[in-house]
Amino acid sequence: MHRSRTSLEKWASAMDLLASEAGVNAVELAAFIGVAHSTAWAILRKLRAAIAEIEASKLLRGFVQAAVCWLAPGYLFLSTSHKRYRKERIVLIGSSVDDGGLPHALKLTLIDDELLEPGTKELAREGIPAAFGSIAVPFADTALLIGKRLVQSALPTRFKEAERWLLRKFHGIGTKYLQSYLHEYCFRWNMAARGGCPRIEWARLFFRTPAVV
C-alpha cells in the first residue's frame, strides 16, 4: 500500500480475494475491484512480494527429500526426463517428511542453469549442495530422490498438484515471475498443512512486511 493511490478499501478487497481458497489473478482482480489491469497486476505483485519474503526465509528442517521436476508448455508432449528443451523451467521440489515419508512442509524453487548438467534436466554433482542450500537448513538430513525412490515418494504427486494450480489459475507463466507464484503455492500448502486459519495467517503476513516499492 506504500505510495499507492489505490484506496485502502480496494487494497483490503485485493487481500481478501488473494487470501481466498481460489486465489485471484490480475484479470479477475481488475474486474472485482474496478481498476485497470496494470493496477491490479501491481497490487498483486506487491502482495506476492510479501509472501515471497516470508517463504524464502523459511527453510526445511529434519529429514528433507527433494527431486528435480520441470514445467513445460503443453506442446512439448514428447518432453523427456533427460534432455532439456528451451521452454522448460527446471524446479527443485523439497519437503520435510515424517517417519512414514509423508510431507509436512513444502518448498518449490527454480534451479539456476549453472547448477545443471549442460543441456539436461539433471543437477550437476557440484550443484547439489547449492540446490539444497536454497530449500533446507545446513544441518538437515537431505536426500535427492531419483528413479524408483522418487516414483514411490509423495513428491511427484505434490508437484503435479502445484502444476495444475498454476495452469488453472494463471494459464501459463513466464520465467520472470514464476518464483513468486511458486512461493504463493507453498505458502498456501504449508498453511493448510499446519492447520492455520487462512484469514489470520494472511493478515499476519500482509501487516508485518516492510513496504515493497
Question: What is the meaning of each model-derived region?
Answer:
Residues 1-213:
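Residue-level recognition of single "structural anchor" positions
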